Amino acid sequence: MTIHLRSSAVRALIALIFVLALGALFNAEGAFFKWDTHRDMLRHISVFGILACGLTLVIITAGIDLSVGSLLGFTAVLFALLSLRLELSAWLAVPACLAAGALCGCVSGGLIAKFRIQPFIATLAMMVFARGMAKSISGGQKITTAILRPDGTYHYADVPGVFAFLNSKILGQNIAVVTLIFLLCILVCWIILSRLRWGRYIYAVGGNEEAARLSGVPVAATKILAYGLSGFFCAVAGLCQAAQELQGDPETGISYELTAIAIVVIGGTNLMGGRGGIGLTFIGAMTIGYLEKILSINAVGEAGRLMLTGAIIVGAVLFQKYRK
């Protein structure tokens, strides 16, 4: 039994089963057993899960990215600005937002890899900078379909098709498109980590950076790639967030990094780097998603949910240290 508990996947599954058992016990008069509850949980956790995909790559390199929430907010505002106000085609707006997110991530990675700035400091600076960019390009206001005319009245623009698509449900309204995007991001990360040379580089850099350097691994390029991909996934999440809210809010995404980090840590990816996987992050997303949903259907307030999430992060980190 002890040997099995040494497996991160087993421990993550035990945590998920425990949370599901709580849901079955405190089922809010049967609400937990309805498919709508599970569908809505998947839709809610998908944006956080997409952020956690990028964070998983960064944390395996022994880094951290505190800017994911702000980059989500920046790209959501940029997407709304390009689509709702400038009325650009989705074929131009989507790639532009994805490139902007990836570029911001590469800047963080470059500061860390080339200038030896601590990941905490570099991404903290990017967190503040990206929030500032979101407020700057939006003028501090939400970008919605309501457009102010010179005479003081409002004109309501049509919702772009890409917004409607990202906010839709398929298969008889049973699966949200954003959930499928989350699963696609999981698949992309799995391919990177399991099938590509750069995935092995990411593990090598996180396991022992100096040994990786002496073995010929391009350490700086690997770190820039990991943070660039994190920024890319932030942009994907930003597009989904803007479509779900039908607006670009410069304040959106605040504290999202807390939930995304919790998903990665609870899944079992080691904060010290070198160990972990995207499958564990998926289990962590399900655990956090179900935990929040169970608290929600049982009318536990937001304050209680936030405090519980913080306590779970501390518990997961202490458990990792105990295992050593």
Predicted regions and their residues:
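Transmembrane helix-bundle core of multi-pass membrane transporters
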Residues: 120-196, 222-225, 245-250, 300
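Transmembrane alpha-helical segments in multi-pass inner-membrane proteins
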Residues: 227-228, 233-234, 244-310
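Single transmembrane alpha-helix segments in multi-pass membrane proteins
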Residues: 20-26, 34-86, 110-117, 262-278, ...
